[in-house]
Amino acid sequence: MKRLMIKTLVAAAALAIAGVAAAQEKTFKFGLQNPKGHPLEMGAVKFAELVAAKTGGRIKVNVFAGGVLGGDAANVSALQGGTIEVLMLNSGILASQIKDFEVYDFPFMFAGAREADAIVDGPFGQKLHARLADKGIVGLAYTELGFRNITNSRKPINTVDDIAGLKLRVIPNAINVDWVKALGANPTPMAFPEVYAGLEQKAIDGQENPLSVILANKFYEVQKNLAVTNHQYNPQSLIFSKKVWDTLGDADRKALQDAANEASKYQRQVNRSKSADDLDELKKAGMQVTELSPAEQAKLRDKLKPVIEKHGAAIAGTVAELQAELAKLRK
């Protein structure tokens, strides 16, 4: 009888230990719009690998690339509800939550990668991410898409005036709609997973994205003209569900934050090293590449200044803070 009781207690203890271990194991979903092989997807995979390494495999992150979990707006709602744990998306899209994130969509804000890194990794970028907590979002780190360029199926763009009349897909927010209108083109807000079909079916003439996105999504199959305009730099936000974050212990939070910081640096390096190669690949794929002359580039900046002034008025404090930080960097 005594031996049976001991066996029963040992078995119960084993089950309890197993239950605790199982309870500590977690699997998170990581959604992003870019396909497998894109630098952002590579950054997401690196994050998953780092999280697994830092938690001894106890936390697993499954990456769902190519928009298979839905568009950005739906994904943000799911993240706030805790049904998707991790996202990587254009920081400007978060203007739907905190209007000040619109500043990341202003044309010609950053002169280069060095400035962008200093801003997003410094107090300015961290302060904006911290404000997301009130919206059920934890901002972990910034990655990048890079500088955006315009493609279309109708004509080469050699001058700013060539952009007029084109029906261009834009990220669904007000500033992107307005800068396209300022150039005399017709903006069409559209979720990213719909863009290829929209181009293929001629519902839109063109779109604008960094070279890596144009290549990875095979837009060259349905777009023959590429204008290297570098009109807008796109930081990306690596964000986490606060609803889930609040259930985690300090050690797990630290592992996730450290993994995000390391994956961010890795992703940017990969993206930048691929940029020149991407342009060559697009040329080989048959795209006709044009660049605006310095005079036309200046004309483009001038046409977009009223858009920046209009949208900057609503977030004047944030714009002034960013411009002050940029002024320090440019001394």
PLM-predicted stretches and their roles:
Residues 4, 10-13, 24-115, 123-126, ...:
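N-terminal secretory/targeting leader peptides
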Residues 18-20:
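N-terminal signal peptide c-region/cleavage motif recognized by signal peptidases
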